[in-house]
Amino acid sequence: MTEENKSFYITTPIYYPSGKLHIGHAYTTVAGDAMARYKCMQGYNVHYLTGTDEHGQKIQKKAEELNVTPQAYVDNIVAGIKELWEKMDISYDDFIRTTEDRHKDVVEKIFKQLVDQGDIYLDEYEGWYSVQDETFYTEHQLVDPIMEGDKVVGGKSPDSGHDVELVREESYFFRMGKYVDRLLKFYEDNPHFIQPESRKNEMINNFIKPGLEDLAVSRTSFDWGVRVPGNPKHVIYVWVDALSNYITALGYGTENEEMYKKFWPADVHLVGKEIVRFHTIYWPIILMALDLPLPKKVFAHGWILMKDGKMSKSKGNVVDPVILIDRYGLDALRYYLLREVPFGSDGVFTPEGFVERINFDLANDLGNLLNRTVAMIDKYFNGEIPAFKANVTEFDETLVTFAKDTLKKVEEAMENMEFSVALSSIWQLVSRTNKYIDETQPWVLAKDEDDREKLASVMAHLAEVLRQTGIMLMPFLTVAPSKMFAQLGLTDEAHTSWGSLSTIGCIPAGTKVEKGQPIFPRLEMDVEVAYIKEQMKASAPKVEEKKEEEPKAEEITIDDFFKVELRVAEVLSAEPVKKADKLLKIQLDLGTEKRQVVSGIAKFYSPEDLKGKKVICVTNLKPVKLRGELSQGMILAGEENGVLSLASIDQNIPNGTKIK
């Protein structure tokens, strides 16, 4: 493989600097950092790009409210973002800002080319616009539409729930439909382009098949942005401006395109699921129009949610990553983000879950294994790691095989962006190694001089597995591995490189261990949970709200309750109900039968999030039709502040089990 073939280009979305970043933003960037570090350790020439999308009406309005220029406003926030990435040890290679000349100059060239070749034309537009989302919607897409007779006169954004306004203005349009067939052919020829797979079906069925309308790509209602060449009253809109960052950052369209030629097309764009459409429909079509290669993969991850839905200052549930890092250390946060949630799915942050991960995984499992190993080597062999010999005890080969299999699992998971799976595999090795200590009982072997060779083998195997564990953790954790290596006396980088994982037992005999402080101290659960909750409450606006008392429900008898039949059901599949933004058509497995239920949870759960979930279903309701679809029951959910959360069941309860 040539050096050129070993390049790897990974990007995050460029973040919108409208306020302070929270743990959700950190999630994407830490994931990108883990992937970049992994590829770098494998010998790839890695280029990791992040940055900020700094133009638009929302930025201009915020700046006006604060009586500062838009540039001064974004400069201040961007400084904070860079400080956060430094604190999180993000190893990005470039930070692109859309207000930089290197970006703006090329965006003007791109827009002019698209106009000159007829892909962009001037016309007039009328549509429902959300300033918060900087997105236009059709009246059929609006949530809670306000009607006057048969006419829609208002409503809310389906993405953020903010109010929309009817906007009529002159605009430049991109001929999207011209490239639809070519885009679908690209999907067919590149089946792994959109990940997870379910996102591809969503793009095709929800956006392309209904008909891809021409896209408004300029605005005249604000002036904070890149001007349209030759028509300066128009500002180039976000679709062309922001998305182009992935190539402008590489020098595309300049006199020096060396970086562009080396790294484009991107190996993977990491994006949140809310911007999949822009990266898998608009961006590929723009690139097709420019006759440029398309990125190899777009990976759409889920959201870090709270128990009461999305993070929001008004709810007092925003988690500031800086607070967690300052109190618990960087590795605790990085580990939690990448371990807790499968990367393509939504996950829920809870203070309890965060502290449990630290105590059980980091302190108990990994920390104790390191402490016990170093202490025993110090006690039984004067702190010197014995020479590695194979198959001295009956348990040695099993442990070595387990370690080799773990490496394969980790590498396979990383190639699929399955960070949680990779970390789970590493922790299975840690658990297996703790079991190896119980099996070999070194404290018993130490009592008999005839077992000296076995004791030495156990110590060498423990040190070796810890070496391998530390190396495999290096993409994820940036502090603990070096502490592990220091306690194991490993100072030669040849023994801590990814390539050294293929050599079992490469620690030189006599390497001196050094006892140290626990790398992850145990936490007091109650104290730390209370602390995190208090910090989250502090994020809420200081406004006293009087909570209305909920009316008490009418009391029923136990006989009334027993009339309701509740059973465990597993979601087999789900899909949107046509012309009904809030409804999902859900197929359930009730053990002895399959049923269809229509539920108003589409705003809170995507179809792919539901698949495989165990839910509670009311099974003896009279079937009804909702929007033309038969509903044969009802799934239970709780509601708080307008956010629905499904009642769920442990996975080990069989489908169809009656709830009593």
Swiss-Prot record:
Subcellular localization, per the record?
A: Cytoplasm
Q: Which reaction does it catalyse?
A: tRNA(Met) + L-methionine + ATP = L-methionyl-tRNA(Met) + AMP + diphosphate
Q: Where is this motif: 'HIGH' region?
A: 15-25
> In the UniProt record, which is one GO cellular component term?
cytoplasm
The Gene Ontology terms for molecular function here are: ATP binding; methionine-tRNA ligase activity; tRNA binding
Keywords recorded for this protein, A-Z? Aminoacyl-tRNA synthetase, ATP-binding, Cytoplasm, Ligase, Nucleotide-binding, Protein biosynthesis, RNA-binding, tRNA-binding
What positions carry the motif 'KMSKS' region? 310-314
Q: Which domain of life is it from?
A: Bacteria
Its family remark reads: Belongs to the class-I aminoacyl-tRNA synthetase family. MetG type 2B subfamily.
Give the record's subunit note: Homodimer.
Q: What does this protein do?
A: Is required not only for elongation of protein synthesis but also for the initiation of all mRNA translation through initiator tRNA(fMet) aminoacylation.
Designated name of the protein: Methionine--tRNA ligase 1
